Amino acid sequence: MPMTPQQLLEDALARHRGVLGCGIVFGDDAGASVGHDEREAPFVPDDGDGEEPGFLISITDEDPERLCAVVRVAEDSDVLGIGIDLASTEDWIQDERGERFAELLFTEREKALISTADGSVPLLRAKVFSAKEAAFKSTAAALRRWYGSHDEELYFEARDFELISWSESRGAGRRDRTAVACAKLGISRIEISFTEYADMAFCVAIAC
């Protein structure tokens, strides 16, 4: 039986130091009290106009279902950010639309991973897509810290991340401008974990 999203988050964080707690909220109101900066990066607001220190947060898109993950970390934690994403298999059916999306968004390495793995192609594609999105989201906290003390813009997209293995320890690779940006942010690796939730692919990404 697949892990629940909560179990997957706990399992992904169990190998890291300085994690004080975590949780996932489900439903339309998930993340309703979360703040967003001018770049739409989420954060936990304090009682004033600032940010509550020691919290990392990530929210899935509203469609098909909204989940909000919150992690509390100590100052010496090796976890720099988290990202979560849900991807529906319906978007990756092997029709003209699904093939076009796959050709546009996936690298040759990712296509090879899909073609050689066991499982349905729509689910495997959904996993790869959710990994790229979650990896991108996992950089949000580090980016907020960067822009708090730097004027230099760091521009990259979810498609710039590449799933290099189904193994969590290898996780998501960072190509070209993304590799440069992550190096500046102090991110040396991004770990990826998967489960299935309500016929969708759910991914947790941990930036370290």
Task: Give residue ranges: language-model regions.
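Core catalytic alpha/beta fold that binds nucleotide/phospho-ligands
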Residues: M1-C208
